[in-house]
């Protein structure tokens, strides 16, 4: 039987560590950590994600400064909002919920966030720190994957890792983190020819392609470890419900095809998703400790 990498359980364990770090630092800090999440427009998925992050903040004692901004906000207005949060002493982390409406310059807005308050690890300076192996905020989903692997004692060093997907949000930082852990890393993407021949060479396969059911039994080797970053809601037809064991959510991987073949896998839901939010909290608490002159007791949680 394969090992199921339970992100929900691990996220709860890490949240307890973060909560204890906050409570032990309050006497010196005189305030709780603060996280500002900016949501632009009425995208339903973004609304769900922001709500989930607010609940996570409540669980561990982080102040939430959520802002729901109008769909047609100008680049200048949103930049000014970010700048005001950069200067707000009670805010330790800022997250710009993606995707943004098409008229906004995502790269310019991410650059406008103070790198020291970059809760999502996407500022160019923090990506540069990742490349150089320096400490700093880390991209949340790849950081969650690394924690999931390490806490389950899955060896990375010396392994052949294949990352399917090359987004700045997941694929590229994921490859960098695996390389820093001494894996030999290959990145595959939509233009990769003969994807199965490449993925079957992997000891560790991380799939972040954003395509439902992209990976099946013909893509994986015996006893590999599969991390499924994707999450999708499928039409509720009978075939999908049967395959998904009566849930309407699926990932990029056909788990029902590979679960008897692999050594370990992350489920969808309950795998990478909870860890992504927990790493957002870890980035915020780490920044809070730094801003308040506290010992950096939780930085080991970030790769």
UniProtKB/Swiss-Prot annotation:
- A cellular-component GO term for this protein: cytosol
Classification via CDD domains: NAD_bind_m-THF_DH_Cyclohyd
- Pfam families in alphabetical order: THF_DHG_CYH, THF_DHG_CYH_C
Q: Which residues bind NADP(+)?
A: 165-167, 190, 231
Reported EC number(s) for this entry are 1.5.1.5, 3.5.4.9
Gene Ontology MF: a single term: methylenetetrahydrofolate dehydrogenase (NADP+) activity
Task: Could you list this entry's UniProt keywords, alphabetically sorted.
Answer: Amino-acid biosynthesis, Histidine biosynthesis, Hydrolase, Methionine biosynthesis, Multifunctional enzyme, NADP, One-carbon metabolism, Oxidoreductase, Purine biosynthesis
According to its UniProt entry, the protein's GO biological process terms are: L-histidine biosynthetic process; methionine biosynthetic process; purine nucleotide biosynthetic process; tetrahydrofolate interconversion
In which pathway is this protein known to take part? One-carbon metabolism; tetrahydrofolate interconversion
Kindly state which reaction or reactions the protein catalyses. Answer: (6R)-5,10-methylene-5,6,7,8-tetrahydrofolate + NADP(+) = (6R)-5,10-methenyltetrahydrofolate + NADPH; (6R)-5,10-methenyltetrahydrofolate + H2O = (6R)-10-formyltetrahydrofolate + H(+)
Instruction: Work out whether the entry's keyword set contains Oxidoreductase.
Output: yes
Family, per entry: Belongs to the tetrahydrofolate dehydrogenase/cyclohydrolase family.
Function as written in the Swiss-Prot or TrEMBL entry: Catalyzes the oxidation of 5,10-methylenetetrahydrofolate to 5,10-methenyltetrahydrofolate and then the hydrolysis of 5,10-methenyltetrahydrofolate to 10-formyltetrahydrofolate.
Assembly and binders? Homodimer.
Q: What is this protein called?
A: Bifunctional protein FolD
Q: Which species?
A: Prochlorococcus marinus (strain NATL1A)
| Annotated gene | folD
């Amino acid at each position: 039987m394969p090992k199921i990498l339970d992100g929900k359980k691990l996220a709860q364990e890490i949240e307890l560590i973060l909560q204890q770090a906050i409570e032990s630092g309050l006497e010196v800090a005189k305030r709780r950590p603060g996280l500002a999440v900016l949501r632009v427009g009425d995208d339903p998925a973004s609304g769900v994600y922001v709500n989930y992050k607010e609940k996570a903040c409540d669980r561990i004692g982080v102040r939430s400064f959520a802002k729901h901004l109008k769909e047609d906000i100008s680049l200048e207005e949103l930049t000014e909002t970010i700048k005001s949060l950069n200067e707000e002493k009670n805010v330790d982390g800022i997250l710009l919920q993606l995707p943004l409406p098409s008229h906004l310059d995502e790269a310019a807005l991410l650059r406008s966030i103070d790198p020291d308050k970059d809760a999502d690890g996407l500022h160019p300076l923090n990506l540069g720190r990742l490349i150089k192996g320096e400490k700093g905020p880390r991209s949340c989903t790849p950081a969650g994957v690394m924690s999931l692997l390490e806490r389950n004692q899955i060896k990375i060093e010396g392994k052949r890792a294949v990352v399917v997907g090359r987004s700045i949000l997941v694929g590229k930082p994921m490859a960098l983190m695996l390389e820093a852990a001494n894996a030999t890393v290959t990145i595959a993407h939509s233009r990769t020819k003969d994807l199965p021949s490449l993925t079957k060479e992997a000891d560790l396969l991380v799939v972040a392609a954003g395509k439902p059911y992209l990976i099946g039994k013909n893509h994986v080797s015996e006893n590999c470890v599969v991390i499924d970053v994707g999450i999708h809601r499928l039409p509720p037809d009978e075939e999908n419900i049967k395959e998904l064991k009566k849930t309407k959510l699926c990932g990029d991987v056909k788990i029902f095809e590979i679960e008897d073949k692999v050594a370990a896998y992350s489920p969808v839901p309950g795998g990478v998703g909870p860890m992504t939010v927990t790493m957002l909290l870890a980035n915020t608490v780490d920044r809070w400790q730094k801003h308040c002159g506290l010992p950096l007791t939780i930085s080991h949680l970030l790769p």
